[in-house]
Amino acid sequence: AFNIAGNPLTLGYIIEYKHNRLYDTQQTATSSYWLHTLEPSYQIQWSGGNVELLLPVEYTIYRCGWRKEKDQKVLFSPSLDFTQQISYLLRMETSVAYNQNASNDDPWFNGTMMNNYRTFTTGIDSLSVQRVALANLRLSYLNTITLFSWNVYVGWTRSTSDHYLKSLYMPDYTLFVPVWNDRTKTTWSMALSCRKNFRNAHINLSGQTNYSYNKEFVSQNEVEDYLRYHALHASVTAQWSGLTWFQPKLTMAGNISWKKPDVFSVTDNLLKNAYYSLTMDFYPISKLRLYADFSQSVFEIVRNHYSINSFLNAGMRYDFNSRWSASANINNLFNRKDYEVSLYQRANFQYYRVPLRGREFMISLRFKY
């Protein structure tokens, strides 16, 4: 670290090496890479705020066993973070960045892999790069006198990849094949959360709502288009602490998701689901905790047809001392054998049942050291 004009300049260097060996029934694929990262950052501080500029540079050398040539990339990812305390109660944080990331996590493979009994994927055999531009703004408010706080967040992301996966769904198998053409995904997101503590009533109330918009390219069975889908979520939690031996907590949440008409579907495909849970903790005597919780979720499977899933659990715990404790739990008292969910995954609607083990009873003795 250095001091320039009264502000810190920090230099960092990271070196990383990774060797991959991927086995398949037909062949073995080996690949390796060296990653050199230089991370300079400069921060300017003043009363109530600061700004930080980061200028990381990555140099990647990638080799694979089936090709003599080596791949190498130089990637530059600048970012700027700004923080300002606007007033005693209000704080603002904003950032902009342009990130370039090489695909160092997934190993290369120059063939077709079998993922499960019917899904196959043609491997990515070259170094790919994802370029991400982003900007976000956050406002935070905190009043310690009225015990009220809120946070507002707005974010935008534009991600460009040098390849995309083309999918082929057939009666006997599913195949994913990479296509080396640039494709872009755009995301807008907004969120609001707030919390209020009513001291005299012993009630802690919190809530949040968020909205997101996504635009993503999909290629499926030789049909291609951009999907535009939306999601809206809201939740409220209330907790009462008026008694030391009884503490209830209620949570309610709801979701609405919809997808704009495209070549895959001519309707908005609106789906709704809701959830609520009630948790009750009892402390009748010192060191003993009894609890019970009930939850119920409602999923819209198709238009105006819903699946209702209800669960009830109960249990107790007794602390003998700071090291020893015993507990007993009963889960899934309604003895449900499965529950149903539905969702959209890109262009496809999924509706399935998740198997459960039914009612369970467990006793445990714990020792902490």
Language-model-detected regions and their locations in the chain:
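Exposed, low-structure sequence patches enriched in small/polar residues
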Residues: A1-Y369
